[in-house]
A protein has these predicted regions:
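N-terminal segment immediately downstream of the Sec signal-peptide cleavage site
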Residues: 1-60, 168-174, 178-181
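Solvent-exposed loop and beta-edge segments used for protein-protein assembly and interaction
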Residues: 5, 31-37, 63-69, 107-113, ...
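Beta-strand elements of well-folded, non-transmembrane domains
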Residues: 30, 43-55, 69-81, 121, ...
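Beta-strand-rich interaction/scaffold domains
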Residues: 64-124
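Cysteine-clustered segments with highest specificity for TGF-beta superfamily mature ligands
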Residues: 102-162
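A short, hydrophobic C-terminal helix/tail in secreted or cell-surface proteins
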Residues: 184-201
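Short, charged juxtamembrane terminal tails flanking transmembrane helices
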Residues: 204-207
Length: 207
């Protein structure tokens, strides 16, 4: 038997907020190609953390004195087959400066600082088995879910009527491929010869 690896299938996901999940779909393995013996999954993602300072005063204010304003968050992403990444982001540069005034009472001026980390990868991870144990991957559509969670905090010196809050987002690509076996050409030729010989033998017996 010859072992063959399929081309990677890929599907994108985009989470505008964390503490969320995304499910993507892949084509199931075509059993006519051979005997499925393994499935490999990986994902690559970008994460963005944003700290926004809100000024509810109708005049501009200075923040970050004596402690600059920033947010930090630990973002965990998990997927099937034990895929996992843990990444800590801090908004950079830490901010000390002027935040615009609220244009009117009941509204606010704002200033945002962001940090993006790209190319965070988990895997590839392979699960090996037999067509029976990997039956869920054969035919139809296969679902892969990526879960993203974050825990964070904010810090810095803020004057009265000013507050800050952080948010995060994540996007990326999930990849899946199949590992399967096909008969070697020589084996297929012998099998074909065997069928031919069996057919001829049956013809002789019937004549």
């Amino acid at each position: 038997m010859t072992t063959v690896t399929s081309a990677w299938q890929q599907a994108a996901f985009d989470l505008p907020t964390i503490d969320a999940s995304a499910t993507v779909q892949f084509n199931g393995f075509n059993a006519s190609l051979g005997k499925l013996i393994g499935v490999t999954v990986k994902f690559i993602m970008d994460e963005t953390l944003t700290d926004t300072i809100y000024n509810f005063n109708t005049h501009a204010v200075t923040v970050g004195n004596p402690r600059p304003v920033f947010a930090t968050s630990t973002i965990t992403a998990t997927g099937p087959l034990g895929l996992s990444t843990v990444n800590q982001l801090t908004t950079t540069p830490q901010f000390a400066g002027v935040v615009p005034a609220a244009p009117s009472l009941g509204s606010f001026g704002s200033k945002s600082i962001s940090n993006t980390v790209t190319g965070i990868q988990s895997g590839p991870v392979t699960v090996n088995g037999t067509p029976a144990s990997l039956a869920a991957y054969i035919g139809g559509q296969n679902s892969v879910t990526i879960n993203v969670d974050g825990e964070g905090s904010q810090s810095g010196s803020l004057p009265p009527n000013v507050m800050n809050g952080y948010s995060a987002s994540a996007n990326g690509m999930v990849y899946l491929q199949y590992i399967y076996q096909v008969p070697e050409p020589a084996s297929m030729a012998l099998f074909a010869l065997g069928l031919l010989a069996l057919t001829q033998l049956r013809r002789r017996k019937s004549s």
